[in-house]
Regions:
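Histidine-acidic residue clusters that define the catalytic metal-binding segment
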Residues: 147-162
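Generic preference for flexible, low-structure residues
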Residues: 20, 52-54, 70, 94, ...
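His/Glu-rich zincin catalytic helix
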Residues: 1-53, 57-65
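M16/MPP (pitrilysin/insulinase) zinc-metallopeptidase core fold and M16-derived inactive scaffolds
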Residues: 43, 47-99
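Active-site-adjacent, His/Asp/Glu-enriched structural segments that form or flank metal-binding
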Residues: 78-150
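Arginine residue identity/basic-tract feature
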Residues: 3, 22-25, 39, 66, ...
């Protein structure tokens, strides 16, 4: 089998940022989707996110994105990476990291400032509704904004090659 694109990124060089992971086209319709790698922690160097805060960011992020005035109709998916170092954001259209950056900043401001009941955190709405950690989700979002997104540069918007 061929190695998939995400495994060809050198995770020893990868740092937190906003990267285009892949751009896919439906061969039948020509529809395009862009997958973004929203990397919150440095792989294999910083601790990964625990499932509870990851789950909370997923609930808040999906709710925010699917209700966004400009982007809601273009959102395909938002959810955690299996390695728990970040999230995937999938949108309709061919979109660059620079173009998605304002939305990513808005999204993580929403998560960082969120107070109250986490949307979808009820037994009839979620299969693991008790696995939530809002204070840690707030903290991770604020750190991503302040440390990684505030003065983001080219090296953190495009994958670097060895």
């Amino acid at each position: 089998m061929e190695r998939i694109a995400s495994f060809s990124v050198d995770h020893l060089l990868l740092e937190p940022g906003v990267y285009v992971s892949r751009i896919d086209r439906d061969p039948a319709t020509g529809a395009v989707v862009t997958t973004f790698d929203l990397r919150l922690t440095t792989p294999n160097k910083e601790p990964v996110m625990n499932t509870a805060e990851c789950h909370t960011i997923e609930h808040l992020g999906a709710t925010f994105l699917r209700n966004h005035a400009e982007w809601s109709s273009r959102i395909v998916y938002f959810g955690p990476m299996g390695c728990r170092t970040g999230f995937y954001l999938v949108v309709f259209g061919e979109v660059t990291s620079e173009e998605i950056l304002p939305l990513v900043r808005e999204l993580f401001e929403f998560v960082a400032d969120f107070e109250g009941d986490v949307p979808g955190a009820a037994p009839e709405e979620c299969g693991n509704y008790l696995d939530q950690n809002l204070p840690m989700a707030n903290w991770l979002a604020r750190r991503y904004l302040d440390r990684d997104l505030a003065d983001i540069d080219e090296n953190h918007l495009h994958y670097q090659q060895a």
